[in-house]
């Protein structure tokens, strides 16, 4: 859904408020991976995954509230849940988490081999790079996931009316 369409629509708790940032918790966890216990990183994935699940359930509930013939209601709800869950899982958790993880691992390795900085400085530099990369990767990943789903999963939907892009 474009920004202009969203402005005219009802405000979405999961997309238009601070709650959206919960979906990025795992990227922050990945950025801090070299400084915190692994349990903290896994907790950040739990927060992001909870956000994804809550958004998918919310979109399914909203799809069920749209007035239409009862026969298509369950299908519409299921499609909304599946589409939102898959989109959010890829765009908010899996792809950005992998990207930040690899960026931080590579930068920590490079800093370790090419500098004589103390380990603490290398780790904080890696964390800073990971945090700075988050806003840079979000929109390209979102658009790539839109393209991926439009080219695959969304072609399987039984009706012409597709769920709106998250």
Swiss-Prot record:
The keyword Transport does not apply. Coiled coil: none annotated. The chain crosses the membrane at residues 34-54, 78-98, 129-149. It is found in: Mitochondrion inner membrane. InterPro entries: Mitochondrial_18_kDa_protein. It is a multi-pass membrane protein. Keywords: Apoptosis, Membrane, Mitochondrion, Mitochondrion inner membrane, Transmembrane, Transmembrane helix. Its main location: mitochondrion. It holds the Pfam family MTP18. Involved in the mitochondrial division probably by regulating membrane fission. Loss-of-function leads to apoptosis. Belongs to the MTFP1 family. This is Mitochondrial fission process protein 1. It comes from Mus musculus.
């Amino acid at each position: 859904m474009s920004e202009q369409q969203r402005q005219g629509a009802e405000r979405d708790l999961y997309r238009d408020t601070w709650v959206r940032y919960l979906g990025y918790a795992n990227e922050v966890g990945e950025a801090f991976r070299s400084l915190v216990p692994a349990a903290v990183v896994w907790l950040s994935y739990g927060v992001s995954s909870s956000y994804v699940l809550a958004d998918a359930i919310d979109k399914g509930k909203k799809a069920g509230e749209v007035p239409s013939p009862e026969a298509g209601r369950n299908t519409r709800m299921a499609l909304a849940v599946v589409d939102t869950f898959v989109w959010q899982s890829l765009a908010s958790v899996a792809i950005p988490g992998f990207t930040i993880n690899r960026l931080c691992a590579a930068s920590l390795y490079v800093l370790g081999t090419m500098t004589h900085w103390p380990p603490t400085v290398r780790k904080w530099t890696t964390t800073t790079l990971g945090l700075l990369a988050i806003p840079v990767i979000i929109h390209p990943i979102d658009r790539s996931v839109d393209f991926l789903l439009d080219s695959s999963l969304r072609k399987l939907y039984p009706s012409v009316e597709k769920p709106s892009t998250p």
